Amino acid sequence: MSTDIAIKVDADHLRRDAFLYVRQSSLRQVFENTESTKRQYALRDRAVALGWPIERVHVIDSDLGLSGAQSQDRDGFQHLVSEVAMGHAGIVLGLEVSRLARNNADWHRLLELAALSRTLIMDEDGVYDPAYFNDRMLLGLKGTMSEAELHILKSRLQGGILNKARRGELEMPLPIGLVYTPDARVVLDPDRQIQDTVRLLFDTFRQTGSACAVVRRLRGEKILFPRRIRRGIGKGDVLWNEIDHSRVLQILHNPRYAGAFAYGRTRTAYNAKLKPVQLRVARSDWQVLIPDAHDGYISWAEYERNQAALEQNATGFSPGLRGRMPRQGSGLLQGRLLCGRCGARMRVHYEPFEGRLRPYYVCNEAVVRHAGKHCQWVRGAPVDEAVSALLLEVMAPAAIDVALAVQQEITQRVEQAAALRGTQLQRARYEAELARRRYLKVDPDNRLVADALEADWNARLRDLDALQREHERQNEADHSLLDEPAQQRIRALTADFPRIWNDERTGAVERKRMLGLLIEDVTLLVDDEVNINIRWRGGRTQSLSVARPRPMSVIRKTPAQVVALINELLEATNDRQIAARLNELGHRNWRGEPFTPKKVMLVRRTYGLKSRYERLREGGMLTGEEVAQQLGVCESTVHQLGRKGTLKRHRYASNHRYLYEPPGNVRLEKGAGSRYGGRQPRLIVAQPLQQGAS
């Protein structure tokens, strides 16, 4: 039987050491349930009574405060298992099975190793030998009951939590800006600065529609955002620092700011290292969602609009995502294009061209998902120009409303930022004054405390001075946004909106934002023409067509009339003269540049036109060398005769190169044209040779 201790403990067991495993599930149990801990340590006396010397009874208590649901992170249990596996343990002591493990996998692995190494296991009920089937079956049953006990406890706790959550009464950690009252009601934080800062975040997102834009604006205006310390030193205190993108997304996704109670937004899972991680759960799978459960900063309808906007801002390849948030890049219709063939979202692709990026609208859904081919693509500039022209036509009646909206938005933004900076400055003054009073109350002889308080006072004064300078600088910058010249520029929208739209200082992001106020989406169908179907806000549609952009090979092609004119001019002029004549007539190449001799030469070679030289040679013209051989003189003499007009010549290149007309049956009169005077050289008809008598 399992209680027959004398039979089970033998000399081989006593030769090895005894290991006492002590564990409590939480630190709270360690401090409050001290009697249970004492009972576990008292098992050392049981081991001594069985014959183990006290110095060979090892206590493993490094797992105090850790749950027994798994062996991960329980260094003490892992050390115990390794000692059993190596045969160093003669007996393992634990108050009950639940102290060793509440997980069947860990428990049965320990039993298997104990059976192989002939290690005994002892609890408060008796001694067991896992090598015996009956003892092993009993230990296995105890392990199963221990795991079931944990499951039952968890189920009861979870059921109570869920039942309370369904009533909306479960107290959960609240985000910054919300607090609990003494009667467990959720209200807005009474700190006015915290309230105004949270409201500013939602107002900024309402204006910009982008989490990144919220971060840029708050950081640009030096607005600090609060964060409450959840645990550790300073728990409950509020820290103020610059906001980041992840923090903005957390706030925008949190339904508590819309006055809703939500439970089950995340679930716990384990990664490859068996570390618990929190995973987001889709809203349709939340266990509890109670709208209008308490006061909030925004309405539930606005919360849902924010979620839809954030989803549309995503730039991934998931179906339905369009990435509508205006980003850098000249593609005006970014995030609003739909393919007229397959209905998928069209994306903007940029290619370098002449030192800048040229946009193309591409439907690459088949390429991404099925390694197929592009559905359709088109150069973006003609489409953007057509949509811009239509937008300017539609915007003319609404220009006054736009100007008033812009002016109101700027004024509201400046006033909100100034008010928040004022509260930050007021808080900094209070903290500096509080540090001063602390310093003045300290005993001057207690230099350790006095020096620390003096350093804290100086730090508060430096922070106050930096905030004061930043506040003054921002006020000057805000004044430039509201002065009379700025007001005139805003009012100019009513009379000259097209000029402002086309102004180089109006960035691509601003144009896209204005376009998004009027246009819902644009569908493109590239055929013989580019068919553009525009769906306006409100559901009205409008269609237009633009000529399909020509291929680059066609764009670069020299017009046929220019090629014919060059061919005609080559009969009497060279490349330089032809270039000058083309420029006089107003002709330009495909880039709009004037013609040069080199460009004329490229056209001539591309189209196989004979050069001026080839045409003169075909007409019988001779080179200077050929004329010199015919006249029996040197080539320099021929050039001299050409310059003086004695020989007729024709220029065929720009570097003073000529071809000569055949001189015919003539010869150069000897003695004429000497270097030092004499008659001018002249050509005379050569007399035929007299035939002698045979």
UniProtKB/Swiss-Prot annotation:
<keyword id="KW-1133">Transmembrane helix</keyword>
<dbReference type="GO" id="GO:0003677">
    <property type="term" value="F:DNA binding"/>
</dbReference>
<keyword id="KW-0238">DNA-binding</keyword>
<dbReference type="Pfam" id="PF00239">
    <property type="entry name" value="Resolvase"/>
</dbReference>
<dbReference type="Pfam" id="PF07508">
    <property type="entry name" value="Recombinase"/>
</dbReference>
<keyword id="KW-0614">Plasmid</keyword>
<dbReference type="InterPro" id="IPR050639">
    <property type="entry name" value="SSR_resolvase"/>
</dbReference>
<feature type="domain" description="Resolvase/invertase-type recombinase catalytic">
    <location>
        <begin position="17"/>
        <end position="168"/>
    </location>
</feature>
<dbReference type="InterPro" id="IPR025827">
    <property type="entry name" value="Zn_ribbon_recom_dom"/>
</dbReference>
<dbReference type="GO" id="GO:0016020">
    <property type="term" value="C:membrane"/>
</dbReference>
<feature type="active site" description="O-(5'-phospho-DNA)-serine intermediate">
    <location>
        <position position="25"/>
    </location>
</feature>
<dbReference type="InterPro" id="IPR006119">
    <property type="entry name" value="Resolv_N"/>
</dbReference>
<dbReference type="GO" id="GO:0000150">
    <property type="term" value="F:DNA strand exchange activity"/>
</dbReference>
<feature type="DNA-binding region" description="Recombinase">
    <location>
        <begin position="175"/>
        <end position="316"/>
    </location>
</feature>
<dbReference type="InterPro" id="IPR038109">
    <property type="entry name" value="DNA_bind_recomb_sf"/>
</dbReference>
<dbReference type="InterPro" id="IPR036162">
    <property type="entry name" value="Resolvase-like_N_sf"/>
</dbReference>
<keyword id="KW-0233">DNA recombination</keyword>
<keyword id="KW-0472">Membrane</keyword>
<feature type="transmembrane region" description="Helical">
    <location>
        <begin position="386"/>
        <end position="406"/>
    </location>
</feature>
<dbReference type="InterPro" id="IPR011109">
    <property type="entry name" value="DNA_bind_recombinase_dom"/>
</dbReference>
<keyword id="KW-0812">Transmembrane</keyword>
<dbReference type="Pfam" id="PF13408">
    <property type="entry name" value="Zn_ribbon_recom"/>
</dbReference>
<protein>
    <recommendedName>
        <fullName>Uncharacterized protein y4bA/y4pH</fullName>
    </recommendedName>
</protein>
